[in-house]
Amino acid sequence: MAAAVVGTLVLAACGGDDEPSDEGGEEQANSIVVWTGDTIPERVAATEEIIAAFTEETGVEVEFVGVDEDQFVQLLTSAAAAGELPDVVGSQPLAGVRTMAANELINTDAAAAVVEALGEDTFSERSLEFTRDGDSQLAVPTDAWSQLLFYRKDLFDAAGLAAPETYDDITAAAEALDSPEVAGIVAATTPGDAFTQQTFEHLALANGCEMVDESGEVTLDSDQCVASFDFFGDLMTNYSVSGTQDVDTVRANYFAGQAAMAIWSTFLLDEMAGLRNDALPTCPECAADPAYLAKNSGVAAQLVGPDGEEPAQYGEVSAWVITSEAATEPAQQFVEYMLTDGYIDWLAIAPEGKFPVRTGTEDNPTEYVDAWQDLEIGVDTKAPLSDFYPQEVVDILTSGADNLSRWGITQGQGDLVGASLGELPVPQAIGALV
């Protein structure tokens, strides 16, 4: 079944025919437009406070616009065609960066100038690798999050199960703990949803499945990938809830105590601790202790399948992109500010999902990592991460930026990563599979 589904996947690379506009924004040097991919209201409000401080310090006015991740390609294409690109695009995942690069919508010289001004050695090596294409610095990396497999440690311990870090252990746990009341595992399966691709890519990388090889040939029909599709299809068909699942239902089922495992990002950590009122855990035990799931959940980050040569972990590096039509000087000034004076406040918006990939300054190489560890997580209630999670979880977060793997980029085929954001062929295949 998986082989048949994989055979239907076609990745159409984004075209590179759109030439950068000659009409830059240099005459608008006191005003820039900034798009963000982070559209959660409280995060937008917090970012606007940082922007206000930037404007007060520099005199540069900023029009701040939120753009949903799943609509990014469409809106970007429309803006480019109309000659109305923003000056800066923030909170951009790697696929978004590559989409812009493939369509020649990026000012790589400006990005390189920012990295040079801040100090190349103040950034994590992996974050720079992921935001480069050969010698070209496509964007300026800012923070990273990791994909995790959350599991009910209390249920695992009671059943004598090993931590779910291998395909075999994940399947064994899903089979042992699946019941009419509790699903063995929940994970995204919705076609057309980037979260579905992120979920599957995490598991696929663990089994040595790559989307493309170094020659640019799509390899989703490889033995490793077919086995990965089979593995995921088996889990979702036999040990999960019925119907399609998305970012909200996966969280809701795990929070209700109706799933033994769930695949989600590090952004789940504050919510699982009961620190966000509109996303509170609802498990029976959570009524008396809202942090019950946080105290009784483990996390697995680096996973490995039977065909994988070494454990792998999916994650995302977010970046600031300076566009080809930008007012270069104020755009660079803005990005530099967001990675210096505004950086700690930026990370504080959601520390559980914003680990600093700029670790410090030339004078204090660990300044930002040290500050990050003291930040409080949560939305409606704030508390240190260490109040709810053991040091091993904190260590997973701090090491995540250096351990991340991604399809296509390490093979020098980053443009196909951007194309996959627009086409989302893998989520379509997952939808057909389950």
What are these regions (language model features)?
Residues 1-33, 56:
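Short, low-complexity disordered leader/linker segments with a strong preference
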Residues 134-140, 171-217, 224, 251-252, ...:
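Extracytoplasmic/periplasmic solute-binding protein
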Residues 159, 238, 277-360:
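Extracytoplasmic/periplasmic substrate-recognition and gating elements
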